Amino acid sequence: MKKILFILSIIFIGCETQNNKDNATWSFDASTGDYIEWQSENDFANEMTNAAFVHLYNVEYEKANVFFEKALEYDPSLFGPHVVLAGLAPAGSEKEAMHVEKAKENVAEKNETSKVFVSLLDLPRQSRWWPLIGPGAHDKWSEMRTLEPKGKLIHYYYAFSIPGMENKISEMESLLAELRDGVGDSESLAVSGDHSFMIAPIVNVLGY
């Protein structure tokens, strides 16, 4: 039964978002690990990026698109929004190609975790959730998780992309325990930021 709910919730995630949006403030200290370098020196760009994450986790792609584009208006040097926006652009379009080019250009001086994240764009576009999920994506997320096990976005997509439904459920439950109860592998527990806005989407995915 849980497997069925998991599959259905991947398609129909979206409830319980308002409380999450109230938490859409950037309180993350990137100096605590080798995370994907999403942060900007521009506070408005950070606010837009964090708001985009809330919509992304709740599969509100049109809204996520708006906020990621706004983040780039405030800080064109960011690479992270370009990765997501490439996947939201029509396949094979000039817009997709532009976002891929900009992501690779802007990540050149960033850390290894960030470069592996951008390398998701090198995977074939064979999934509606490309480049974050699809053939080959789990290997990339696994590499990122090895580089920085505390990263919660990394853990989320590591769990979502892992082969096998039982494995997906197990990893999502582990992530939920970390976020909601502060229980889990000490190397994986978050040490900075408020990730509570991720709890409801994970609960929805699990079908609880």
Segments from the language model and where they lie:
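Residue-level recognition of tetratricopeptide repeat
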Residues: 44, 77-79, 148-154, 186, ...
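Alpha-helical segment of the N-proximal tetratricopeptide repeat
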Residues: 41-67, 118-132
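Alpha-helical repeat scaffolds
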Residues: 95-107, 132-145, 168-183
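Bacterial signal peptide processing site
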Residues: 16-18
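Alpha-solenoid helical repeat scaffolds
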Residues: 49, 80-84, 115-118, 156-157, ...
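C-terminal motif of bacterial Sec signal peptides marking the signal peptidase cleavage site
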Residues: 12-14
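TPR-adjacent "capping" and linker segments in tetratricopeptide-repeat scaffold/adaptor proteins
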Residues: 31-47, 106-117, 190-196
